[in-house]
C-alpha cells in the first residue's frame, strides 16, 4: 500500500484511513509505504507514531519539503517491495474486504495491470452518503471511456509496480496525476479492470469541489487533452468536444 500525508491533512481522518487498511481489513497488507510530504502537525505525527508502534509493516519516508502528490507517490512506488501495490488516500475509508477482493481478482485474471472499483462519497459521518461514482468494468470499455473521462477511481486502485514504472510512473499535474498516468499506461497497452463493487468510501466536502475548478484545474485538464491528441489517442473533433464539455462543467 502507498499513502502520502501532508500538513493540511486532518489527523482524525488520517487515523480512520489507516485503521481501514489495517485493523478493519480482512487481509492486512504486507507493507504500507507512508510518505510524509514535508512538515506535519504534532497530531498527525502522533497518529504515525501510534500505527508504526502497532504494525511493523509501515515503511515511513520523510521529506523535508512538500513536493506534491505526484512526486510523493512516485517515491512511494520506488520504495515499495512488492509487485502489487494498492493506492490509499489519507482521509478516505477502504471497505473491509477491499484487498481480499482485489487480490482474488488478480489471481483469477493475472494479465490485469490496474484494478479499481466503484466509490461512494460521504460528508461528515460515513453513513451520510451523498454520491457514488460507478466506472466501466472491462478493459475495452475502460479504454474507450478514457478518451473522454477518467475510467478509474484513483483511490481504489491496485496495480502492478512494473507496469506503472514502464509508463513513467506519476508525474505532477494539478489534481490529475492519476488520469495522466492511466493515459500513458493506455498507450503502453496496459490491461485495466474494475470490480463492479464499492471498494472505498471517499470523504468529500465543498473544499474538494472548489479545488477541482478554476483556471489551474482547467489547464491541467487541457494538458491531458493536448497529450491525447498529440499521440493519436483521440481525434480533433473529440478533442474539441472534450474541451467544450469541461468549459460547460465550469472547470474554469
Where are these regions (language model features)?
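Short alpha-helix within the catalytic core of nucleotide-sugar-dependent glycosyltransferases
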Residues: 18-19, 45, 74, 82, ...
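Short aromatic/hydrophobic "clamp" motif used to bind/position activated sugar donors
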Residues: 85
